Amino acid sequence: MDQPIFILGALREEINLIRKLMNVKEQLKAGHADVWVGSWERVSIVLVRTGMGKDCALSGLKGVLSRTVPALVLSIGYAGGLDLRLKVGDLVVADKVLEIDQAATFSKSYLVNPQQPDLFERLTSQKKIMIYKGTLLTVNQVISDSSAKQELGSSHKALAVDMETSSIIGHCIEKKIPFVSVRAISDTMEQSLINTSSFVDGEGKVSKIKAGWYAATHPSAIKNLISLRSQSQKATANLTEILGVFLRTF
């Protein structure tokens, strides 16, 4: 296959295992985005760490599209659960993406039409990892409160929420590029998250100094931080495993 697959993730933690498994031939910057060019599972890959949010994701995608046109764009990463069935480490394959504005009202809707019609069936053959197919919400802020997640899931009949996918699929549809979104649940609907805005910047980079200060001044949050790290590691491992399965059959 001459055309590569683009794999876009917002955070270093989301893509780190993929980067370690890749045969990296080139590393570069595309604007603010970090890019690794190489192969994984004998498939040509362009791995992109875009940074958090719709604007960063779109900018990163446009940056790598200026170099080459892919066979497929994969939007990957973490998502918050909006359905009681979803547990940490479960995966969501989006068949529809909704973009919700700051007031949590309906904004845009995109249908996902994967080039691989049996994608979901092939992925669900991995019985040890639960995979769901359904609606993914994109908002431009972290949804940290469990009641807010419950309301979003109920109002929009969605399985999960992220911060990047709608801008990626919107541009892919415009450019007629095949698109797939696979997200791993890092926090469940019942779980409220701590506010990380004081130590995580707009590109999703964690300041160790600021995070340390937050932990020192909020000792009760240390347990939650450790738990979230463990959950994120499980989400990353499951996501990477399933993406490897997908590439081996692509």
Predicted stretch roles:
Residues 2-5, 29-250:
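Glycine-rich phosphate- or other oxyanion-binding loops that anchor nucleotides, phosphorylated ligands
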Residues 12, 21-34:
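N-terminal glycine-/serine-/threonine-rich phosphate-binding loop
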Residues 18-21, 25, 64-67:
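Generic N-terminal helix/loop capping motif
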